[in-house]
């Protein structure tokens, strides 16, 4: 990136002149957070430069400055106006990626021979990851499709390794992958199969880049058992808040629309509540039923209901809380319901809030101050077009669409803080209820009170790419200084990077200069413009004057992505139709597509990827911290995310935290509400005449008057009037009317209707599809836009599809298009509503809703449920289940079907419908999930801890896991055993480091003799070493490190003066050299060699002297020149065990210099080994804890602290935490520090925490008389501890699972990195197995078997008791004219809770051919003693569904309803009716019962053997007596595929039951043997439904020819039963004497021939 300049050559020449007399000022500007592996810009300037200046920029590691991480060069000269930039890129090394503390680098710019150096914070953020799932919600067993978009900081695609984890709602990872996007162009496409047995709730996909694991991006999806709704509901309050003084309450509009756009008719149940933090208070009295007509309804929360529902019932107690509203909308047909909720409607005293979040906190005296006032509604949304005014100055403005108003205030030439109060000025709001807010702005501090200022201002407009922004530079300086200012340098920061650098020149005398800035897509979503000028002020000081401004840009893509219609415009499309999509995108872009059913977003719209979400993530990563300006020039740079350093000492503060400083939060002021008198609710005045009239009305339940009066709520006067009239007036009979009914399908079907076989059912109903990535867009046009036309076939759903697109391009980055909607519908269709799952053998009702959207045409329709042997229903293999109905124009009819699922699994339910006299039809085939009976049980079989080191034998742990006890398992169901393995990550207990700030006293200037200099140098060396090791310079002061290193260099140089010719050291040159002091110099210099340049030759010569001059043959070191300053030698001062302690001390010093001197001193290794042998031999005799500790460290360095030496060392410790001598605090700190180093050398991390804790508790921070050794050793040991101790214990487990049903063992390796990952193996076999574990660390083995267990006892309904019966109506009942008969339906229900159930619903489906008596329903729902609140039937159509609303259901007595139902046409088989009761409050609390005139409980007939059932509703077999049957007929039929057996039998016994008949037969001849290994003369049981009794007419003692199919064999061998069904042949075989009769002769001959043929020849193949 090169800086831009003004066009004038003259200005350039002027700029190249020296700005003022004196030295030029060199400046370096970088972002104050540099990102690893990312290109960053460094701005370099020479103000007042001359000639050509060579500049190099080098980035070093911090603090050591040993590595060059990046190096770039440039020139500053008159051609570039002495302004240039370089681009640096810092590689991600292991040290920089460490998660211990914040990491920094040192950036050094060298201008000729002038160095400018700055320490800069680095960020490990590699870029962004955005995750898109194909849907927001999934069912168990389905597949999550997802894409991960890998982009850098500019949102451009990047190829990197990404780790992706899927986590359960409990945060347990179950899948972890690493994927590279290197050749994927930034788009990773992945999938995950959700198990059938899975935790419901919100799951997470988490992703991070390999080189920045601490920066995790995530997306959520929900797992739930659900069925997509057919419509959506929105709740829109008339205002986005509730104004506490509003007497009219809160109005909420309910909008309900089908997903294909048509309006919904139905009923909404609405309840309001108050949210107080996490607590919800439900306002039970607000529960109302709202009719939804043409898609709209309105619910009102009355003010009094709101006040009465909370404690205390005062308006001021509600302020600050919010209102929520829940609505459940039920379709008129009762076939579908949708719940919706709106939360966070704030209760407020003022409808608006004022914020100053977009206003700078600093102003320039006597210059305009731009106040950006942000006004919001109480829900946080922008408040548009609200007038605002400042108090005092009375400046007015109006908020724009984004809620922001700009108010420019002229400030006075004072340096006092500026207090500004802003208030709204909205009409119709009392003065006391207007919003007000006060802020204080502080004056910008100029250097040395020079009063030189710069003010940047921008107009308040919504900026879009392509527009030009005029930035005004306002200058205010002393007129004499103005001529010195020739230019402003400006920088633009965007997305944490320097986007643009340039100069804006000014002519003399110009107070205002305008920079026209062209906005490009790179400026999205916002940017900061920082500008400054520099001059030498009147006092001769170099000064920098700066300002900044934050500018918002309209959030949109940086590029282009549009999905639209590429074919002819159509309002609606038909299912399965081909449509053309046109995709417009940037050149070279790759576009990821998905089409999602809008019903998915009705259930969950939280987790969609949008462009807004992308910008939110990017804005959060902004390194700037304020809306602009700053406390002074340095504050302007820092707050904008920049760091500045100049050669003349002007610089910004050090940034040490990636997060912006958070302002302290203020507590809300208590709001005093004006006391107001509350409106009282009006009293209900009873109408006594109405009470009397109602008493005279007919009551279908025939209750006595006293019982009826109990339902009256209107008071005693009304009860008296009601009873008086009820008891003396005869009942009025009212005529029944009929508006239409189901008609029976005629057998002589008309020709003008499409046959069922020709109707192709719709069967493709995916919730999402079109999951594809497009790469082959056409060549770009002149605007750089590429297009693609895609032809796709729509799926079969009647809905609206949202087509979502996300693109990624190399130049324009990531872009999320606005969703493109495709609506699919037809004017006649079936909506088949199936539950998520049904239970095998349990009768259920499903509904097919037939819609007619024709404008003015009623449709006569034949509808049919197709036969499927997996279900028992009125559709059988022999008889179709057809009905004819009429659907009025723009209406719908619900057709209920009762079915019994017979088999577990996924089975198809298919309904077809055709319209008479039109070529219009529709069919729907959907899959229904049938689950086993009983309850799903998760049985924990075993939970074992895996810890082979402690629980195993020889390092191997074996666990035998038994099979689960499944004695209560439902027959014919599977079990699944899950074997779960998880590592147990055990954290290593670590102690905190000593706070670096406490070490400031240790940084000191060394001086004095050879001993005093070391006493002065020691604390600084060890303090710098400790702060380096614990990453604490940011606390201590990053700039102090350089100063400390200078002091170490000084001490080093001074110490060399005391080096004798022999290379040994003493206090003075003339004194004999000291062994201890020389060894100590080696120790300190060896450590300092990591910090400053130390001459290794000098150091190693000193080492040689120690070995050659002072070590005896037995390894001991001797002292011949004791030190003068005995206080510096610490515990060595004690004369006991001196040989051992000196030898250990020197050995340690030599070992610490080993890395530097090993190559130069050949004898170093031997010398250390000899000294070690000496210590080893004398260790057992030691008595002093000090000597035990120092010698232990020396031995541990050589790996010799083992066995009894280790035992002695550990036993010497007091309380296992210190090596202590009486009354010797400093010696004890020193000795315990040596002991800690010994433990660390042995990697014994479990023993170290108490030792470190003891050292920390001494609160010893070094310094003071006699502290040299204690200071050095305590900080050396604690630094080593922080460096060495791992943050966790080792975990490396190998686990193998040996399942008998598998050939080989399943193996898993558990490492620390993946410890929390839940590994699982599944098996369908319930068997005993073995688990074997080896290795280090801990894990957990859990074994869970999931199966369906039988329910104990009959399951009652949830929370409701329900009885339903139907009986013939008395002869006296008056029938409607065209009714064939009448019956009375009795429904009794009782709530099983602790109190009455409010707002309950009876959903009743009628038996085929029946309709309810409308007058009865009117009577029940009107009058003061009404039993039902309201009833609803399908408008203008067949009354085959009825919904009754009850205000309450008693929990003490049964509430009963009775009403007549009339039969309008006869049908061969009457399908049972169903009654369901449920409470609005809890839709799961349901109870369902069936009814039928002939079947008790209204249940379809099933044949059951043990726990397995089959349908018996099919027609009986054809009894072969009617027509003559030939020999050929018998042979053909008996040899049909599927026929299993052919027997001659004799009936010996009949058992006639209520439902089924059993016939015991003896097998007399096996004509064709089948699956049953039956022998002649054995008995077998034949079973038939009672409906077939008359058709069969079997006689005891008679013989029969019987054959049947294998599917009619029942039970297990040897006790097999035979079902007599539609495929069974039963033919009377005449007795021998009957064969003599002429009429039987032919049959007897044929039967004999048939038997012979079958036995001799069998069936032809």
Swiss-Prot record:
**Protein name as annotated:** Complement C3
Disulphide connectivity of cysteines: 557-815, 625-660, 691-718, 692-725, 705-726, 872-1511, 1100-1157, 1357-1487, 1388-1456, 1504-1509, 1516-1588, 1535-1659, 1635-1644
Cellular component, GO, one term:
cell surface
User: Could you tell me at which residue positions the Isoglutamyl cysteine thioester (Cys-Gln) crosslink is annotated in this chain?
Assistant: 1009-1012
Pfam families in the record: A2M, A2M_BRD, A2M_recep, ANATO, C3_CUB1, C3_CUB2, MG1, MG2
Q: Where in the cell is it found?
A: Secreted
Q: Which organism is it from?
A: Bos taurus
A Gene Ontology annotation in the biological process aspect, one of them, is: vertebrate eye-specific patterning
Q: Which gene encodes it?
A: C3
Regulation of this protein's activity per its record: Complement activation is inhibited by VSIG4.
Chain positions found as Phosphoserine = 38, 70, 670, 967, 1320, 1571
The segment(s) forming the NTR domain are: 1516-1659
Show which residues constitute the signal peptide.
1-22
Subunit structure, per the record?
Answer: (Microbial infection) Interacts with BHV-1 GLYCOPROTEIN C. In absence of complement activation, the C3 precursor is first processed by the removal of 4 Arg residues, forming two chains, beta and alpha, linked by a disulfide bond.
Q: Where is this site: Cleavage?
A: 745-747, 953-954, 1302-1303, 1319-1320
Cite the position(s) of the site with description Coordinates Mg(2+) for interaction with Complement factor B Bb fragment (CFB).
1661
Per the database record, which ranges form the Anaphylatoxin-like domain?
A: 691-726
Which residues are reported to be glycosylated? 938, 1649
GO MF terms listed in the record are: C5L2 anaphylatoxin chemotactic receptor binding; endopeptidase inhibitor activity; receptor ligand activity
